[in-house]
Amino acid sequence: MGLRNVLRIGHPALRTCAAEIPDDWFGSQRLQQLIDDLFDTKLACSGAGLAAPQIDEPWRIFVVGMGHNPRYPDADPLPDRALINPVIKSIGDELSAGWEGCLSVPGLRGEVERWQRIHLKWQDREGAFHTEDLQDFHAPVSYTHLTLPTKRIV
């Protein structure tokens, strides 16, 4: 499929809870195509992350990654990866506020408060589990796309 349309603010799919990717999808062409479509669409829109519900797919998966990005000129590079069935926990109580954008709300940014540090657990394309602690720009990007649906903006 390649590039997909990004749903815009107000679309009901952006307020629907995403379902976990079933075990029998791991390693399948269907999952690989969904991941490829998410990355292609994110790249075409100069995004840092994109969640499946944003392209009208009801699954708990998001992709992140960027090198130099004109939308985030001061951000450190973020490695490309697909995070499937992610679970997040805050590390400590420290919150930070930052200006964030969303591909589903083009042209607008808002100040959003997020956990400064998070512990993230997810599965990769093949179903293997991974864990990582994230902070600074990497934590809010992951948190934003993990917590869809959100009613703050969409």
PLM feature spans:
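Single conserved hydrophobic/aromatic residue that forms the stacking wall/gate
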Residues: 150-154
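Positively charged
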Residues: 1-146
